[in-house]
Swiss-Prot record:
PANTHER family for the chain: GLUTAMATE--TRNA LIGASE, GLUTAMATE--TRNA LIGASE, MITOCHONDRIAL-RELATED
InterPro entries xrefs: aa-tRNA-synth_I_cd-bd, aa-tRNA-synth_I_codon-bd_sub2, aa-tRNA-synth_I_CS, aa_tRNA-synth_I_cd-bd_sf, Glu-tRNA-ligase_bac/mito, Glu/Gln-tRNA-synth, Glu/Gln-tRNA-synth_Ib_cat-dom, GluQ/Sye
Compartment(s): Cytoplasm
Protein family per UniProt: Belongs to the class-I aminoacyl-tRNA synthetase family. Glutamate--tRNA ligase type 1 subfamily.
Gene3D superfamilies per UniProt: 1.10.10.350, HUPs (3.40.50.620)
Chief localization: cytoplasm
Record's protein name: Glutamate--tRNA ligase 2
SUPFAM superfamilies noted in UniProt: An anticodon-binding domain of class I aminoacyl-tRNA synthetases, Nucleotidylyl transferase
Organism (species): Orientia tsutsugamushi (strain Boryong) (Rickettsia tsutsugamushi)
UniProt GO molecular function: ATP binding; glutamate-tRNA ligase activity; tRNA binding
Residue ranges annotated as motif 'HIGH' region: 9-19
Superkingdom of origin organism: Bacteria
């Protein structure tokens, strides 16, 4: 059997780390077993689906390195769904309903007030043909529900959570075709999964009830049921992550926070598993590590600091030749290999390099302790002559110690403030050659 997985986002908002984790896990599973990965755009919601969100989904997945063997829109397949609709009607698994949303809301409130779960009463099954004609004449529009078989339990062996059981009597018959004739994604999804021979459906645990319903849809259409797995959800400190909550979307991580794609991939592929979350440089490494059985049943708490730490580890170990084109893209084409090696240990994101470029070549040095003026003047006079190298710092410091007897913070902090304007950063021994001898002296003497 060829492994075929799919990712089926709705273009009604931006991708966030929760649904991208689903995409990544499905992609990794397909790659692990030399299978195929399909991107399906669930755009059946005509009112909320937007072209710009579809384009953003493509951009985000490509940025992460997640590619697909084929892709399609559900909206272009509505005609293909008609045959399944007629089959389910003729077999008695789809039935006509005429209640308005207001009528259904009244029924729901009545059930809750009486202490019953809000499960559809199936009153529409009692309608005669004449009553249906009368309702249509009065302006009521037909929609269709899928008839759940409530006489048998729904059971499957979940790839992540183990055996899951559902009592069909606790599930309301879902509306699958709206009044305007549009088929809702729940049934469309099953029809597509059958036609595209999806072998494994892996998605978030918030879809477990949908899965129970869709198992019966597969059976009603006479199709084999794919293997099913449900990932635990990613949560923030304040609760569930959503595409409508800022700070978790992929475009925010990329465009505002400046995170590397492999930092996102590492965090999402390894968090909540028995593997350590580490900074791997390639998706191929994650494919090797991937094991669906290693995923925990417990929810994951998203920590942005952990993502930034992974990002830092990646940058620290990135070679200059690999990053040079990216530096040009962010407006720093003149960054040399020496500069990159000097500052990369102090970068949390690639954009941080702009800070060090500013410090070395376009400084605004306003931090200065007046009591250190004489010390800095003396230090300027002891600076080695000629072109500064990585070894110049050690020679310079030894000369300063001999002349002033200053050591430790009393020696280093005035020099760092005078040369960079801040109290932290790359080792000064690496910054000196970048700043250059004349500029070093000028900064030391600027308040004389």
């Amino acid at each position: 059997m060829t492994v075929i997985t799919r990712f089926a986002p709705s273009p009604t908002g931006k991708l966030h780390i929760g649904n991208v984790r689903v995409a990544l896990v499905n992609w990794l599973y397909a790659q692990k077993y030399n299978g195929n990965f399909i991107l399906r755009i669930d755009d059946t919601d005509r009112d909320r689906s937007k072209v710009e969100y579809h384009e953003a989904i493509i951009k985000d997945l490509q940025w992460l390195g997640i590619n697909w063997n084929s892709s399609f829109l559900q909206s272009i397949r509505f005609n293909k769904y008609k045959a399944a609709k007629q089959y389910l009607i003729s077999s008695g698994r789809l039935y006509e309903c005429y209640e308005t949303p207001e009528m259904l809301e009244i029924e729901r409130k009545r059930q809750l007030t009486s202490g019953y779960p809000p499960i559809y009463s199936r009153k529409a099954l009692e309608l005669t043909k004449a009553q249906k004609v009368q309702l249509q004449a009065e302006g009521y529009k037909v929609h269709y529900r899928f008839l759940i078989d409530r006489n048998k339990p729904i059971i499957w062996n979940d790839l992540i959570k183990g055996e899951i059981k559902y009592d069909g009597s606790n599930i309301s018959d879902p509306i699958v075709i709206k009044e305007d004739g549009t088929m809702i994604y729940m049934l469309c999804s099953v029809i597509d999964d059958i036609e595209y021979r999806i072998s494994h459906i892996i998605r978030g645990e918030d879809h477990i009830t949908n899965t129970a319903i869709q198992i019966q849809m597969f059976e009603a259409l006479g199709a084999a049921i794919p293997q099913l797995g449900h990932l635990s959800l990613i949560k923030s400190d304040s609760g569930k992550i959503s595409k409508r909550i800022g700070g978790f979307t992929i475009d925010y991580l990329r465009d505002q926070l400046g995170i590397e794609p492999m930092a996102v991939n590492n965090l999402l592929a390894l968090s909540g598993t028995s593997n350590n979350v580490d900074a791997y440089f390639s998706l191929e490494s994650l494919i090797t590590k991937f094991d669906l059985s290693a995923f925990s049943k417990s929810a994951i708490i998203y920590n942005e600091n952990e993502l930034v730490t992974l990002n830092h580890k990646l940058l620290v170990n990135t070679e200059y030749d690999t990053i040079k084109h990216r530096l040009t893209a962010i407006g720093l084409p003149d960054v040399t290999k020496e500069f990159w090696l000097a500052v990369r240990h102090n970068l949390n994101t690639l954009n941080d390099i702009k800070i060090w470029w500013q410090i070395c070549y376009l400084p605004t040095l306003d931090k200065f302790q007046e009591q250190d003026a004489e010390f800095l003047k003396l230090a300027a006079g002891l600076l080695p002559s000629g072109k500064l190298t990585d070894n110049s710092w050690d020679d310079w410091v030894q000369n300063i110690i001999k002349a002033t007897n200053r050591r430790g913070k009393a020696l280093f902090m005035p020099l760092r403030l005078a040369l960079t304007g801040i109290t932290y950063g790359p080792e000064l021994k690496y910054l000196l050659p970048l700043i250059g001898g004349e500029e070093v002296k000028a900064r030391l003497l600027r308040h004389q």
